[in-house]
């Protein structure tokens, strides 16, 4: 099903854009990822100055850390400890007898990652790069001052809620809660209501917080022409699940940072559109500074109403789009008899130094084998394309130019119509 779904998406996009799609960028997120801290220590026999090689050895040792059934997608350096002193930057040149490196490893289930890549391979879709979605999202919706001063980015999705904690420009914690706005819909549907009607009621009437004085005990919401639900019961259902999600978010904020989040909490995602969501977060987290990121910081021009709605639902997709630095489009698709097949190099994927680097940055997922394969394929495609175009140009130069056969037929027909000898 996944393979078929991927193929259908590509076909629909190509039909809409009238352009071949040669490569794609992929965002990796959801319940499959988690951030886990790890510490590596190097004891020195005598006091010595820290070298870059020592730093690299700590990082390599961390990368080599084995987790049961999981693999490291990316590693964030949290801090270094030189004897008893903590340092944010690599302490090269500092004398010590004990060097410690603290890291946040972002993990995913190894089998899930393998199956995901296999689905793309079976669908014949080339992956140009993979990004960890929460990190890409953070780069697109958070300000520098929020990351520096400390903040919690909360992505309220349909099935999951992702919490990313930043402080001093460093990701400190990454967690995914298996609860989202779809759970609210399911709770409403549990009252013998169709899923579609439950979703409609949620979008129209749901509020993350309703003051007791605003609840009208005599008011009912229409489910359909014959059925109604009491406002008070509806409010209780929505607020109970919303509060559960928010309290789970609060529990994931480490005590050491609870008083240091100068940037407050930033909400995004489709669930952030619920009425009074900011008020509910202030009430249950006791953090006063709350804002909602409805759109990415990048300037994006589009005629698509979903993009222009700027309601937070597409922030992650647009964030991954902003990360891409290569064109994924291939040749144009001919839509009529008179449109020839155009040869273009704009969709050619030529790996840059950044794309083929052995180290992942800004949430880019490390996959050396895939990078080498992409680079080799791109070079082969480049050489093949150049040869074909060169051969085609030579053939065209050698052949005398002749009118198109269909054009000749039109000329003959036109002469018959306009001939003065015609009876």
Task: Tell me the role of every PLM-derived stretch.
Residues 52-56, 284-317:
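Conserved phosphate-binding/catalytic loops in two-lobed NTP-binding clefts
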Residues 28-29, 207-209, 261-284:
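Glycine-rich phosphate-binding loops at beta-strand->alpha-helix junctions
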Residues 73-75, 151-155, 200, 308-331:
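A polyampholytic, Gly/Pro-enriched intrinsically disordered region
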Residues 1-23, 28-151, 208, 231, ...:
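Nucleotide/phosphate-binding catalytic cleft detector across ATP-hydrolyzing
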Residues 105, 110-118, 134-135, 166-242, ...:
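Phosphate-binding glycine-rich/basic clefts of nucleotide- and phosphate-handling proteins
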Residues 26, 120, 155, 188, ...:
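Residue-level signature of catalytic and energy-coupling elements of molecular machines
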Residues 1-16, 185-189, 303-311:
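N-terminal phosphate-binding loop and adjacent alpha-helix
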Residues 24-30, 144-173, 188:
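Gly/Thr-rich phosphate-binding beta-strand-loop-beta motif of the actin/hexokinase/Hsp70
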